[in-house]
A protein has these predicted regions:
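Long, charged amphipathic helices and adjacent flexible linkers at domain junctions
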Residues: 127-156, 346
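Short beta-strand-to-turn element immediately C-terminal to the catalytic PLP-Schiff-base lysine
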Residues: 29-32, 65-66, 117-118, 154, ...
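Long, low-charge, small-residue-enriched segments that form tightly packed helices used
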Residues: 330, 340-351
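Structural signal for interior beta-strand "rungs" in well-ordered beta-sheet cores
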Residues: 144-329, 333-334
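Generic beta-sheet signal
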Residues: 16-17, 40, 106, 320
Length: 352
């Protein structure tokens, strides 16, 4: 690489260069009769480079290896003698060459590796190239990316063989997914861990763990500190924060679990929540194994529901439920006959 070549030749400076068909905007590498690098000429302003120099296709890649002591000496001698009135770092090469110090180029064959970024258009172009390389590496390793044009995968993401990434998915940070996962469409994973065989469409996961064969979504939201164990299900419009959902447990729909532990094979009814915040601090809800939760339950933490317990629909659970017991916390329904007629009579003096 650059550093190894620089050290081996004992150069004062070694600069990475490449050749471009259209070198517009790049500093040109000027070589002497012996083929050695003499200096780099900038082309920001018309007066800085001659027409002949502008025809040069070898350009400065913007990466250097310096002898630090030589660099310090050369920097003190730079002058803003250019159309921009600026100090140009590449002028150091001319100073060092004039002092008979070693000045060399390290050519790179692939020019895309050295594309410069001068504006947001350049930034988008470079990002697209980098993303294409990431996609190709994953696909050659056995990952299916259905629509690379709408899929973003960060450089540190790891994906297992036979995993499928559907369109409009964003895999960010240190996300890791095992083999045979189904990710997306419209899914975002940020620093998330997925085991093997996980399915996660239309969902948003941040700093969480999802173990083998778990099923998430659509429209699940997993927040930091969440662990979903093997074969568990977290379904539609479910938000889970700092909670542990046990193996084979089900949280199918319309639920908020915050600071909760749900035991293996338990079922949380639709429309249930854990009330975990008392206005000053958070408290945990502990739900045991094989618990049958009714719909529209509120678990007011701190509270514990024992193994094999049941909770009735519409209950607000504020006290612990013993193992195997049924927790009911609601008023029995009472029907008031003739209510509509009396209400209308009160409002407008009429009955029907």
């Amino acid at each position: 690489g650059l550093l190894e070549a620089h050290v081996a030749a004992a150069n004062a400076v070694t600069v990475i260069t490449t050749r471009l068909d259209d070198p517009t905007g790049y500093g040109r590498v000027v070589r002497g009769p012996d083929g050695g690098v003499e200096h780099v000429v900038e082309t920001k302003a018309a007066a800085d480079a001659t027409d002949a120099e502008r025809q040069i296709r070898e350009v400065n890649g913007g990466l250097y290896a310096f002898d630090a002591s030589r660099l310090r000496e050369a920097l003190e001698r730079l002058r803003p003698d250019n159309a921009q009135g600026e100090l140009y770092l590449p002028d150091v090469l001319k100073v060092l060459r004039g002092d008979d110090h070693g000045v060399a180029a390290f050519p790179v064959e692939d020019p895309t590796a050295l594309l410069g970024v001068n504006d947001r258009v350049d930034l988008a172009r470079v990002r697209e190239l980098a993303q294409r390389r990431i996609h190709e590496a994953h696909m050659r390793a056995g990952v299916t990316i259905v629509d690379p044009a709408t899929t973003t995968i960060d450089a540190d993401v790891q994906l297992g063989r036979d995993t499928v990434v559907a369109p409009s998915s964003f895999l960010c940070g240190a996300t890791r997914a095992g083999e045979d996962c189904r990710i997306g469409p419209l899914t975002t994973l940020i620093d998330a861990f997925l085991g093997d065989g996980v399915t996660v469409p239309h969902s948003y996961l941040v700093e969480c763990e999802v173990h083998d064969r778990a099923i998430l979504g659509p429209f699940a939201y997993l927040r930091p500190g969440t662990v979903i164990r093997e074969g568990a299900k977290v379904g539609t419009f479910v938000e889970v924060k700092n909670s542990d959902v046990g193996a084979g447990a089900k949280v199918p729909h319309l639920t908020y679990l915050g600071d909760a532990d749900v035991g293996a094979q338990s079922n949380i009814g639709a429309g249930s929540i854990t009330a975990n915040y008392d206005g000053f601090r958070k408290h945990r809800t502990k739900i045991g194994k094989r618990v049958h939760g009714g719909v529209d339950n509120s678990f007011v933490a701190p509270v514990e529901v024992g193994d094999d317990a049941w909770t009735a629909a519409g209950s607000i659970i504020v006290d612990d439920v013993p193992p195997g017991a049924l927790g009911i916390a609601r008023e029995r329904q009472r029907n008031v006959e003739g209510y509509d007629a009396r209400k209308r009579a009160e409002e407008d003096g009429t009955e029907r």
